[in-house]
Amino acid sequence: MGKGVGRDKYEPAAVSEQGDKKGKKGKKDRDMDELKKEVSMDDHKLSLDELHRKYGTDLSRGLTSARAAEILARDGPNALTPPPTTPEWIKFCRQLFGGFSMLLWIGAILCFLAYSIQAATEEEPQNDNLYLGVVLSAVVIITGCFSYYQEAKSSKIMESFKNMVPQQALVIRNGEKMSINAEEVVVGDLVEVKGGDRIPADLRIISANGCKVDNSSLTGESEPQTRSPDFTNENPLETRNIAFFSTNCVEGTARGIVVYTGDRTVMGRIATLASGLEGGQTPIAAEIEHFIHIITGVAVFLGVSFFILSLILEYTWLEAVIFLIGIIVANVPEGLLATVTVCLTLTAKRMARKNCLVKNLEAVETLGSTSTICSDKTGTLTQNRMTVAHMWFDNQIHEADTTENQSGVSFDKTSATWLALSRIAGLCNRAVFQANQENLPILKRAVAGDASESALLKCIELCCGSVKEMRERYAKIVEIPFNSTNKYQLSIHKNPNTSEPQHLLVMKGAPERILDRCSSILLHGKEQPLDEELKDAFQNAYLELGGLGERVLGFCHLFLPDEQFPEGFQFDTDDVNFPIDNLCFVGLISMIDPPRAAVPDAVGKCRSAGIKVIMVTGDHPITAKAIAKGVGIISEGNETVEDIAARLNIPVSQVNPRDAKACVVHGSDLKDMTSEQLDDILKYHTEIVFARTSPQQKLIIVEGCQRQGAIVAVTGDGVNDSPALKKADIGVAMGIAGSDVSKQAADMILLDDNFASIVTGVEEGRLIFDNLKKSIAYTLTSNIPEITPFLIFIIANIPLPLGTVTILCIDLGTDMVPAISLAYEQAESDIMKRQPRNPKTDKLVNERLISMAYGQIGMIQALGGFFTYFVILAENGFLPIHLLGLRVDWDDRWINDVEDSYGQQWTYEQRKIVEFTCHTAFFVSIVVVQWADLVICKTRRNSVFQQGMKNKILIFGLFEETALAAFLSYCPGMGVALRMYPLKPTWWFCAFPYSLLIFVYDEVRKLIIRRRPGGWVEKETYY
């Protein structure tokens, strides 16, 4: 890990004069690849002399102040470089000019262009295009502000890393201890840390006293890790003599030499990696882009065709250009941008009620199209609390209750051996409940002490009553705390039972070490010699519990004889003056971080929904595999290569990996794999567990899944997960246990840390995709009755049947609430029983949807509108045949004697009132046919009668659009404001037959689709 990596990422790349962008891009990619590699350092392998030579540090006096200042000037401060952030105004501009908005802007500009052409060439130009341009601009700006506000609630990634950086550090310089600002710590500094401190930089430990650090934010291991000067592992992340920047020292003290600072630390590399990753385009953004291409294509095709046609029909150039612009603008669905935004927002709110907080609106749908979930183990699939799972005493394994509400199995608590075992577990234990929690349930109480001891404390408190009282009865005299060399913990207590000797020695520790110190064993309360048979029984039990991925501890005791150890005897723990061999073995207790109750069911749902769940954890492979089996990630009956080898009793190398459906991959193996080998694993195994993985490997796994074409969701809670969260199509962070950093990198936060909430999210995401299709189908259909009047106006030269203002009243008025109401529609079938959609083939808007909306339903709607138009003009004396070619005279304000079919003469004002009445009636007809369209859009396959009319918002939408249409028609003053005139009641009914026709036509179509799945009708019309 060269000194320069990380830091030079932010310095401008050396680029030639021509500004060779390729070079810059290549350099950035190289840097990112460099960061993705495993941490490479050798400081943990060096002896103290070699360290002294490498860093020039006196191991007792530290650096001199002058030397420290030189290094500080060379390396810069010990701080993380903030990433280049996107300014707020650019984010706002993205909302204003991104995707769909661009289409509306082009429409608005074209409107202003058309208006300026008219203003320049006509004496009294009509203001329609001006109004339209203003309205389009307003729609984009309002919707843009709304989306920006929705997303501005989430903030930037790096600031949370800053909260993790320690403020002060204790260094030794010139032989004196001094507290300095952590930013001034330099490579080679001698640093001291104690329990409660944050580690100020990456340190090579040179001396330690009972030091333990919490690496969970970095490696995901929930247990505190011991730190000592010993070199214990080739991998720097696993060895005991390196402590990492910004992890916490939990207990003890240590002294170390700084080997890396700032961006060059392991944490700094992760920070740089997370901020340097480009998040790809969300699936829904890609869908909307595809949709815009289709709409633009249709608009331009129609516009250009009619432009050429109008020139053939001998219109002037200027008129033809205005027609061209009018047609393109008429194709733009003005209300759709707002509809999509509101639908996504509603779903986001609905998900928040179900404990999924969505930060990025488009991520709502991404979760629905997810095909692979890479889940962290600790805290997501498990409860993140060590719990006693099994005991072995009286030569049999007993199961403890690990459920969250203690509703599980229980065991025989009356055995004398169990009483002895629980006594050791309670006494030889330094964990205590924190104060004032008596009224809380035992499992919910906070404990001071390490995870395993807390588990024992809670278990004994549940089974045997107050541990505090037990400890008061058996007063502690002396203890030897646990350390890594002898691997046991021992204490001696006063024994209140007068029938027994007055001193009781209790010990717990690594099972094999404890057994070595015992010569007898307690069976059913009686002490018996420990023979080979019993030793084998112990070995089998130990292997079985260990194979379940559980952490096993052994327990033994000894009553110290009164004649050697009378009352008041001075026990000495340094120069041990009491027996620590020939003890009596009592039993084993094993602990595990148990799966959450709802997870197996959730994993099952994912499987039936076609989603592959992969476990990626920093934990031990055996534990990972046990939990994977417990939650169903590895299902019953599926074997790994190791299982097959064990069953057939052959070496692993002889098993064909393709025979195993499941596989457990160790991080160290992953390190040596090529991307092709990883691809093979992901392709040929359905159930995969990655164990002992590093943060960089998580990222490589996510990229591997994406290479397979999967849409990947990643869950995580540690800092170590942030690069993977950022790279995934959707990152899901934990709300309770998650570090700030992971929450910043994610798109979604699980407020209850429960994997099961993801499944709810998937369901909501799939539903919104279906419902957006319905919404778009509904909205697009009214485009045809809006465009055709304009086209017929050009071709047949008839008076304009529908005006611009009325089109806006439909798109931004009557159609809005019904379109949004479809977001509340319930799923037609079990959406969690089908495969995830394929983003390449299953589009939001496909040719079939366009053909249904434009070609079939839209055409029937247009017929309904024209029927009403011809009825009104005929009632006023203009028969349809008489209208052909009438446009030029009709629109000429200087001609006041246009004759109708019966010879009556009409002035310009009178003609226009009839024309605007037709506009109003055409508008009302569209509302009437949209009733049927709304009802048929409720379902894509089922009959409306199967689905029912339970959607109250949709029923409200039907009434709302009708009321709005009536208001616009009958409200006094509308004739002046919007040029809309009152209609005769009978004119409302002209479109009813067409509305009924749409309903019947679509019900028949869906019936055929249900009767003949995969047939011609489904292939051509099922969107």
UniProtKB/Swiss-Prot annotation:
* Listed result of changing residue 302 to R: In HOMGSMR2; results in altered sodium and potassium transport as shown by in vitro functional expression of the homologous rat variant
Q: Which top-level enzyme class is recorded in the Swiss-Prot or TrEMBL entry?
A: translocase
**Which GO molecular function terms does the record list?**
ATP binding; ATP hydrolysis activity; P-type sodium:potassium-exchanging transporter activity; phosphatase activity; potassium ion binding; protein heterodimerization activity; protein-folding chaperone binding; sodium ion binding
Q: Where is this region: Disordered?
A: 1-39, 216-235
Q: Where is the active site?
A: 376 (4-aspartylphosphate intermediate)
Q: So which stretches are on the Extracellular side? A: 109-131, 309-320, 793-802, 867-918, 971-985
Q: Which UniProt keywords apply?
A: Acetylation, ATP-binding, Cell membrane, Cell projection, Charcot-Marie-Tooth disease, Epilepsy, Intellectual disability, Ion transport, Magnesium, Membrane, Metal-binding, Neurodegeneration, Neuropathy, Nucleotide-binding, Phosphoprotein, Potassium, Potassium transport, Primary hypomagnesemia, Sodium, Sodium transport, Sodium/potassium transport, Translocase, Transmembrane, Transmembrane helix, Transport
Which residue ranges are assigned to the Cytoplasmic compartment in the record's topology?
A: 6-87, 153-288, 339-772, 824-843, 939-951, 1007-1023
Question: What GO terms describe the biological role, i.e. biological process, of this protein?
Answer: cardiac muscle cell action potential involved in contraction; cell communication by electrical coupling involved in cardiac conduction; cellular response to steroid hormone stimulus; establishment or maintenance of transmembrane electrochemical gradient; intracellular potassium ion homeostasis; intracellular sodium ion homeostasis; membrane repolarization; membrane repolarization during cardiac muscle cell action potential
| The EC number(s) this enzyme carries | 7.2.2.13
Modified positions (N6-succinyllysine) are 661
Check the record and name the PANTHER family matching this protein: SODIUM/POTASSIUM-TRANSPORTING ATPASE SUBUNIT ALPHA (PTHR43294), SODIUM_POTASSIUM-TRANSPORTING ATPASE SUBUNIT ALPHA-1 (PTHR43294:SF9)
The record's family statement is: Belongs to the cation transport ATPase (P-type) (TC 3.A.3) family. Type IIC subfamily.
Summary of subunit composition and partner proteins: The sodium/potassium-transporting ATPase is composed of a catalytic alpha subunit, an auxiliary non-catalytic beta subunit and an additional regulatory subunit. Interacts with regulatory subunit FXYD1. Interacts with regulatory subunit FXYD3. Interacts with SIK1. Binds the HLA class II histocompatibility antigen DR1. Interacts with SLC35G1 and STIM1. Interacts with CLN3; this interaction regulates the sodium/potassium-transporting ATPase complex localization at the plasma membrane.
Name it. Answer: Sodium/potassium-transporting ATPase subunit alpha-1
Q: Which organism is it from?
A: Homo sapiens
